[in-house]
Amino acid sequence: LRDSLITRARNKLVAEFLKQKEYTHLFFIDADIVFEPQQFIRVLLYEQPLTCASYPIKHESPIEKGDASFGWCMNFPLGKYDLADNDKGFKTVNYAGTGFMCIERKVFEQILKKYPTIKYKTDVRANIDNEREAVAVLGNEEYAFFDCGIQGQGVLEDKENTQRYLSEDYFFCALWKQCDGEIWCDLTSTLKHIGIKEYT
């Protein structure tokens, strides 16, 4: 899939996924994530609707230069960042990056049921080379599961009045949490994130 906007690309993939009624899980794996097969299996088979694994932010520690990252693409509940919630090594987190995330069909269905206004129609050719195919996709229905937004505006709630700006992956996590969902992160599968170097 070629698209200049990551938000639109993710939404397009979800729309195609939802058209295939026999599909049960959508697993996002970004091209810059390095993982082992067993890490994929752990996240896929964990019995929760939304699961993921942690990977480092592409940012060096200002104290120790090297391959070690300064942070992780996830956000823990305040004061609960040290231990997994169970002996399988998974923990609930506030938000997580979508670069290595497994999502059951019912997650999208529940969000769409609560927020039907996120539906929109495509207005781009989606980089399709064939003119006839390009015209055919114009006006297709897609859904803004992945968008950027400010908490307290649009469909985003803001109970703590933070007015925080959310990236597209945190936006999606916020929608799912507003449906009483949880984000379960595998803390034992430490992935690598490729940038100007391989961050660990």
Residue ranges of each PLM-predicted region?
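A generic structural signal for residues located within well-ordered alpha-helices
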Residues: 9, 98, 167-168
